[in-house]
């Protein structure tokens, strides 16, 4: 996505690159929200598969399902952050995307102060803080995009370009998906390894998945 967007911006102008950027963003966000809804519905089955060691404690299964349904909302949010970050990086504002993890970490740290016996699930504030962190990250990048005037076009400009360059935009979008699949497959290999680790860790003592996560970090 980044090389194609950068190429269009350099060779075909900012307006055409913006149209391509917007179309890819909309399609990715739509796909991820559909996927998130599917995960929300099927989360109990996913937890049974990912953490078979929890099945002997129904309370843990229910709490894990609740927390997972909240934190899965972060998936489309961080994807939006990554795509918006492409625009800031190509414009030379590398620090903007690099700063966003600080926002998430700060949100989670603040969430730690709300952990107490009031909550049925004590780690619930952390799950909520993760989602809030993602939302704040998006707002931060959008503010920076506005501040640095990365996308400053009127509707007439974009409509005229879209009519003239519709075939080129479609071609580049198709190229994006073709290049996305091999990259997703490569990343999927790592995720399979983490998946197996999680399944095995769930069969060990309480907190093993957390220990594995922190060790990996």
PLM feature segments, named:
Residues 1-217:
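Membrane-embedded alpha-helical bundles of multi-pass transporters/translocases
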């Amino acid at each position: 996505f980044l090389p194609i967007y950068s190429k269009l911006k350099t060779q075909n102008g900012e307006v055409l690159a913006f149209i391509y950027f917007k179309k890819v963003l909309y399609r990715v966000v739509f796909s991820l929200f559909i996927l998130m809804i599917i995960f929300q519905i099927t989360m109990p089955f996913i937890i049974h598969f990912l953490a078979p060691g929890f099945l002997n404690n129904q309370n843990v299964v229910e709490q894990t399902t609740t927390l997972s349904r909240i934190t899965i909302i972060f998936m489309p949010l961080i994807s939006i952050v990554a795509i918006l970050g492409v625009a800031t990086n190509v414009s030379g504002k590398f620090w903007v995307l690099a700063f966003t993890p600080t926002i998430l970490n700060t949100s989670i740290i603040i969430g730690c102060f709300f952990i107490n016996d009031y909550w049925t699930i004590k780690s619930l504030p952390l799950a909520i803080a993760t989602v809030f962190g993602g939302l704040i990250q998006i707002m931060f990048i959008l503010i920076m995009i506005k501040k640095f005037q990365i996308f400053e076009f009127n509707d007439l400009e974009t409509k005229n370009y879209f009519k003239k360059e519709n075939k080129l935009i479609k071609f580049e979008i198709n190229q994006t998906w073709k290049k996305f699949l091999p990259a997703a497959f490569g990343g999927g290999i790592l995720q399979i390894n983490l998946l197996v680790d999680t399944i095995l860790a769930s069969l060990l003592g309480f907190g093993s998945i957390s220990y594995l996560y922190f060790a990996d970090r």
